[in-house]
Amino acid sequence: AEQRGHEIEFYNIRQCFMKLDATTPQIHYRGGSAIEPLDAVIPRIRPAQTFYACALLRLFESLGVFCLNNSDSIIQSRDKLFSLQLLLKQGVQIPTTGFASSPLDTNDLIEMVGGSPLIVKLLEGTQGKGVVLAETKKAAESVINAFKSLNANILVQEFIKEADGKDLRCFVIDGKV
């Protein structure tokens, strides 16, 4: 960016705060000074900062600032269930996936995805955290019930042996993978 003549500023999300009003909405930084108008924002957001960071991005968006990843796309990508629903809507094949609210549905959920082995995922986890391979039905029941006892939202997915423990990440830019 600098080689192309752009000026770059780095802002720590946790040190930004906002002013909302009808005439002069603003984003401020650290010592209280308003951030000067920006041409673009390239957000890098940790999962724990999603709610607050997306609120800031929505204000940037409403001020007409281009955001490389807009708030809606970040929120969609952080919600595994919603992401899977969006992929299905576009005709993308996904592993058979189950989602339920009650531990009473555990056995039906396990059978729905083809039985064990299966994958149990926390909806909020990232980078492989909160992902468990349950090799037996008993292990699956234990993991699901443990997560449910913590009121955690989980997905149960069929295990795809051919994936060899890896997932595939693709970027789509201007309609091309």
Put a short name on every predicted segment.
Residues 1-68, 73, 82:
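ATP-binding N-terminal substructure of ATP-dependent carboxylate-amine bond-forming enzymes
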Residues 6-13, 57-130:
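A conserved helix-loop-beta module that forms one wall/lid of the active-site cleft
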Residues 14, 46, 123, 159-160, ...:
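Anionic group-transfer/hydrolysis microenvironments
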Residues 26-29, 84-88, 113-115, 136-139, ...:
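Short, hinge-like loop/turn segments at secondary-structure boundaries
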Residues 33-35, 111-113, 123-126, 147-148, ...:
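Solvent-exposed alpha-helices and their adjacent loops that cap or buttress functional pockets
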Residues 47-49, 100-104, 161-162:
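Short beta->alpha connector loops
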Residues 51, 78, 164-165:
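Residues that form or flank phosphate/diphosphate-binding pockets in enzymes
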Residues 132-177:
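Phosphate-binding site of ATP-dependent enzymes
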